[in-house]
A protein has these predicted regions:
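Alpha-helical linker/edge segments of TPR/alpha-solenoid repeat scaffolds
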Residues: 63, 93-122, 218, 385-386, ...
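Short helix-capping/linker turns of helical repeat alpha-solenoids
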Residues: 19, 26-31, 44-48, 60-62, ...
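N-terminal signal peptide c-region/cleavage motif recognized by signal peptidases
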Residues: 13-15
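Hydrophobic/aromatic packing residues within the alpha-helices of TPR/SEL1-like helical repeat arrays
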Residues: 39, 75, 228, 364, ...
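Short proline/glycine- and basic residue-enriched helix-capping loop/turn segments at helix->loop/beta transitions
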Residues: 113, 117-158, 184-224, 240-251, ...
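Hydrophobic face of amphipathic alpha-helices that form TPR/SEL1-like repeat modules
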Residues: 19-26, 51-60, 91-96, 246-249, ...
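Alpha-helical tetratricopeptide repeat
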Residues: 19-27, 36, 52-56, 225, ...
């Protein structure tokens, strides 16, 4: 039973795998108490595989007495969290238990589920509400050493805009490669100018660095050198986070708009889509009355045959304006994304649709559930669930920027409380920000 329930989790669900490396190491060395502790640490993060493996431990009676009620409890929790294997085990196990025991397991699973802090990982929030208009925003200078070596990368930064529209404080939240582009990014953001609104604002930006579309050979070489896919699939949160970062860089620097289809099969392959590296570029067109963005299909002449989705306009309104209109001869038999500001030129960008395996959010979410602080902080920027989880764990960086947001929203008492908690951890940025707010 041990082979079929615990070890097979690596084989049957490697694509949805939690961070089982430490726990499985303890398990294989028969340190069952430590393995149980490690699995339990992941439950608040909504880690379905940890729940499944706890069920297996109690089912097998390894390091503990066999307890089918507890086993069913954890298998039911795993099912609630999305583990597709749990249903078959639950079906077999319930046949061994009385109605009373089944009810006990159901109640215990509900209690455990109530303690899960991350139940759905989605892009839930944007910080661009009431954001001032851009006056000037120059691109960062490419560091000479990085350019000479063909190094690509990115920075994620948060910043504060003062009442006059000047950037008064900047912090690098994430970087790849480590610190390579920090100086250039900070200098660029500090030079940005926004419309004066008479009040302060908080902003967040990701700055990507590449000398044109990324080189397939260089990206592949990097992934192979660090064995990103192999270790990510094996459950390493560090490799999952890095793989997500690479996917983010590929999508951002591609000349195609990247669509993620959650319904596509998760088929492991080391071969990256050619469209990530294609030099086919977007082009311009003009369709009177259309604004916002939309996804469309075209025929052999580049004429729009269907509108798949639209944002600023409803789909019916966008269809009335777009269907039957010719985009360009280069837009034949394709799937395209259109976007335009009111009364402005229409931009047409080809679309590539890929599975979640080529999604940064997929790998960052997995890494976060598996304990990667970097990934958790990345997701906390737009997910209240991850933000609250890190606040509850007194993460200084999240305390700082959540405190800033609270103060800018007028909740001075709560904002200062959060900043003070970060300052108590000697987080210098928190002290600097408190002084200017």
């Amino acid at each position: 039973m041990r082979k079929s329930l615990v070890i097979s989790s690596l084989l049957f669900s490697c694509l949805a795998q939690a961070d089982l490396l430490d726990a499985l190491k303890y398990y294989e060395e028969k340190h069952y108490a430590q393995a149980t502790t490690e699995f339990n640490k992941l439950l608040p993060l909504g880690n379905e595989v940890a729940a499944f493996n706890l069920g297996a431990i109690y089912h097998n009676g390894e390091g503990t007495a066999v307890d089918h009620v507890k086993a069913l409890t954890y298998f039911q929790l795993a099912a609630e969290l999305g583990d597709s294997r749990a249903a078959a085990v639950i079906s077999a196990l319930t046949k061994k238990l009385s109605d009373t025991e089944q009810q006990q397991a159901k109640q215990q699973a509900s209690l455990l589920l109530a303690q899960v802090q991350i139940k759905e990982i989605a892009e839930e929030r944007t910080d661009l509400i009431d954001f001032p208009e851009v006056v000037s925003r120059r691109a960062p200078a490419y560091p000479k050493n990085a350019a000479a070596k063909g190094v690509f990368g990115y920075n994620v930064l948060r910043f504060v805009i003062d009442e006059q529209g000047n950037v008064s404080a900047v912090e690098v939240l994430g970087s790849f490669p480590e610190k390579t582009f920090n100086k250039s990014s900070i200098a660029a953001v500090k030079s940005w100018k926004y419309a004066a609104t008479g009040k302060k604002h908080q902003g967040k930006v990701a700055l990507h660095y590449s000398l044109g579309p990324l080189s397939k050979s260089k990206v592949t070489q990097f992934m192979q050198k660090h064995k990103l896919l192999e270790y990510a699939v094996a459950g390493s949160p560090q490799h999952q986070y890095m793989l997500g970062t690479v996917m983010d860089l590929l999508a951002t620097n591609a000349n195609y708009h990247v669509n993620i289809d959650k319904n596509l099969a998760l088929e492991l392959t080391t071969e990256l889509p050619e469209q990530f590296f294609s030099r086919k570029s977007s082009f311009r067109s003009k369709i009177v009355g259309f604004y916002g963005s939309a996804e469309v299909k075209t025929d052999a002449k580049g004429i729009v045959t269907a509108v798949i989705s639209a944002d600023k306009m409803d789909k019916q309104q966008a269809s009335a304006l777009l269907v039957g209109k010719e985009l360009d001869n280069d837009a034949r038999h394709g799937h395209y994304r259109l976007w335009a500001d009111p009364g402005k030129t229409l931009y047409v960008e080809p679309i590539i649709t890929v599975s979640q395996l080529h999604s940064s959010h997929y790998w960052w979410s997995m890494a976060a559930k598996n304990g990667s602080l970097e990934a958790q902080r990345q997701l906390a920027a737009f997910s209240p669930q991850w933000e609250n989880y890190l606040l509850n764990n007194n993460d200084a960086q999240v305390l700082t920027w959540s405190g800033v947001r609270k103060m800018l929203q007028g909740d001075t008492v709560q904002g200062q409380l959060l900043l003070d908690k970060a300052i108590a951890q000697n987080y210098q940025t928190a002290a600097e920000l408190k002084a200017i707010l």
